[in-house]
């Protein structure tokens, strides 16, 4: 959702927020000079190819990281059409490996209700943002394997958002965390399942 970035920029702690750039789809936000300038000024966007991260993007990211900046990236490469997550692409993992930096996984719950893809006006709703522990690529780990590990970490955070920390940790340890992409069923059943998940998130009360 286009609501993700504004919410994250107001939720990330100050020491990192003021040195944070947003990796934005080059083909969408930087299609012309005007839109690129607006994105850069409004949210601190920098262009990233979402289909295949090239050497130019990798070198730019490395230079920014070396200068002390953090980069917010969306590993799915685009917005969800129905509110469920999508499979992670390897671009974010590739950049993390090239830059030799840790990745902090973040899960956002409910932003699709605020501003779903195709909608122009936001509407009030409740969201949950869950931050995980930093992850570092293992020695010799390739981008695809690291991306899978990042996706599993975000799935565990999504489980925590609808249950509790202890149960989510147990399922993550057992490898049984609910997937981000939702059930492989018809469209109406996916919509119902997403609504049920959101209702559980709204009813949840943290134990600490």
Segments (PLM) and residue ranges:
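Catalytic core of membrane glycerolipid acyltransferases/transacylases, capturing the structured
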Residues: 1-52
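Non-catalytic C-terminal accessory region of glycerolipid acyltransferases
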Residues: 55-208
């Amino acid at each position: 959702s286009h609501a993700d970035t504004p919410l994250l920029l107001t939720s990330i702690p100050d020491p990192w927020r003021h040195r944070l750039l947003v990796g934005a789809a080059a083909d969408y936000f930087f299609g012309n000079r005007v839109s690129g300038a607006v994105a850069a000024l409004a949210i601190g966007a920098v262009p990233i190819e979402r289909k295949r991260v090239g050497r130019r993007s990798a070198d730019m990211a490395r230079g920014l990281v070396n200068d002390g900046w953090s980069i917010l990236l969306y590993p799915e490469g685009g917005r969800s059409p129905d509110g469920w997550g999508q499979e992670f692409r390897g671009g974010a993992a590739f950049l993390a490996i090239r830059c030799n930096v840790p990745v902090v996984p973040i899960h956002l719950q409910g932003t699709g209700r605020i501003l779903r893809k195709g909608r122009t006006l936001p509407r009030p709703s409740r969201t949950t943002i869950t931050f995980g522990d930093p992850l570092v690529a293992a020695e010799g780990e390739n981008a695809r394997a690291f991306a899978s590990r990042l996706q599993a970490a975000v799935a565990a955070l999504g489980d925590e958002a609808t249950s509790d920390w202890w149960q989510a940790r147990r399922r993550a340890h057992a490898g049984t965390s609910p997937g981000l992409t939702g059930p492989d069923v018809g469209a109406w059943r996916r919509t119902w399942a997403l609504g049920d998940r959101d209702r559980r998130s709204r009813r949840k009360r943290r134990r600490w």
